[in-house]
Amino acid sequence: MIKETMRNNKLFGLWIYLMSDCIIFAVLFAVYAIISSNFSTNLINHKIFNLSYVFLETLILLLSSLSSGMLTIQKNKNNIKIIYFYLLLTFFLGLSFLLMEVNEFYKLILENCSPSQHAFFSIFFTIVGVHGIHVFFGLIFILSILYQLFYLGITNTIRIRILCFSLFWHFLDIIWICVFTFVYLNGVI
C-alpha cells in the first residue's frame, strides 16, 4: 500500500511537471505565431529549412519513442538484458536526434540566420533549443537509470523511474510533432 502511494505521488508530480512544460511550450508557440503573422516567413522557411533532413530527425525521434515504449513493456518482465537494450537504443536514437539538431543550428548560423538577425530566428532557436535541452536531460535520465540498473538490478523503484522516463520521453515526442508541424511544415508548405 505504501509503495503504491509513493508510485502514485511520483507519477502525479511528473504529470504536474509535464503540464508546466506544456504551458512553457504553449507560450513559445504563441510568440512564434505572433512573430510569423507579422512577417513573411515563407521566404525564410523555403530558403533555410531542409524538410527531408527535419523529417529524418522526426523519424529518429519517433523510433526512439517506440523503443521507449518497448522499454516500458519490458520493465515488468525482469529480463535485464532486454531492458538494457531498449535503454541504450533509446539513448543512441535520442543522441542522434540531438546531434542532428545541433548540426542544423550550426548550418543556420553559418548562413547568417542566427537569433540576433531577426525575431523569427530568435523564436525558432528558442523553441527548437528548449526542446533540445529537454532531450539532453532525457539522455541524462537514461544514463542515471542505466547506472542504477547496473548497481541495484531491477527494483520497483527502477521500474517507476523507467515509467517516469517513458512518460517524459513520449511528451518530448508530442512536443516535437507540434514543432515539426507548426514551425517546419507550416512555414514550408
Curated annotation (Swiss-Prot):
Protein keywords: Cell membrane, Electron transport, Membrane, Oxidoreductase, Transmembrane, Transmembrane helix, Transport
Subcellular location as annotated: Cell membrane
Domain of life: Bacteria
Chain ranges passing through the membrane: 11-31, 53-73, 82-102, 123-143, 162-182
GO CC aspect terms: plasma membrane
Membrane topology: Multi-pass membrane protein
SS bond list: none
Segments on the Extracellular side according to the record's topology features: 32-52, 103-122, 183-189
General function of this protein: Cytochrome bo(3) ubiquinol terminal oxidase is the component of the aerobic respiratory chain of E.coli that predominates when cells are grown at high aeration. Has proton pump activity across the membrane in addition to electron transfer, pumping 2 protons/electron.
Protein name: Cytochrome bo(3) ubiquinol oxidase subunit 3
Lineage: Bacteria, Pseudomonadati, Pseudomonadota, Gammaproteobacteria, Enterobacterales
Gene name linked to the record: cyoC
